[in-house]
Amino acid sequence: MINRRSFIKSVGAGTAAMLVPPGLTQAAIGKHTNVILIMSDDTGYETFGCYGSEQYKTPRIDELAKTGLRFNHCYSQPLCCPSRVKIMTGKSNVRNYVYWDVLDPEEKTFGNMMKDAGYATCIAGKWQLYGEGTFAPELAGKGTLPMDAGFDEHCLWRVKEGGERYWQPQFSVNGTMTSFDDEDAFGPKICTDFICDFIEKNRDKPFFAYYPMMLTHVPFVTTPESREASGPKICTDFIFHPAMRWLDEAFIPEQQKFEDMVTYMDTLVGQIVDKLEEVGVRENTLILFTGDNGSPGGSKGGVVSELNGISIEGGKGKTTDAGTRVALVANMP
């Protein structure tokens, strides 16, 4: 049985083996493999059609699974920051975890390795690794900045400052704190567009893009696809499902928002795939899709999913199957 860390490590080693020293010219590099790693936030394996869900609509990710590899057993940490540190360094948290929202600046990440191998590098989405000092003031600013982790370009939420992540967000864009004030500005779409622009600019050279998504972390919000819907989108069959009896009726729209966020996350993955096709680099680009931990749990802010006739309560934060089992899909034509 292969886990995510072993798989990513083997992919990285295989990719590096195909590369020549960075000092050689682009012509000498020849045919290269681009890599895009997408990691969703708070979506357990049970929220994807390719894992058997009929409740969630994820056609673009399902297609990647159908035409690529779907791993049935992939396990993360039960919380986001430990997972982010682990996947970026390839090390168990017992070896290099410092504290919440801190990535040890002495650690070498896959961004550093890909840049050293001659790749253009980009990251967009959620950072939260510099050290905000919320829980440990003495560690504020003691973590790692994206440029020090090997990324040439970035569009990130929570680098040095917080702010909104969804509607009218505030992001660090290549080191400059930027507010997106247009009423239609939606953070995940901005980050996806940033990655697509990066792909466009680097179509003729090896590139690596890491997309630690903000979707579908709380707060549950409407998306550009669902924002214009009139009234709460409540499925009456779902309200009275036995698995939902512990939830009051006022909470059901939040469940629907989560489902809509999963669908929109899938749409954004599809946008990246379409961009690769558009610029003619899909055939030599490896796409990896995974998650940082299980779906949200708890009596308020938690979700319940149906999978193969079984009700699964979100297990984020727990060292259980529901808290640590995530999707892993690899696709390269």
Predicted feature descriptions by range:
Residues 2-333:
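Formylglycine-dependent sulfatase
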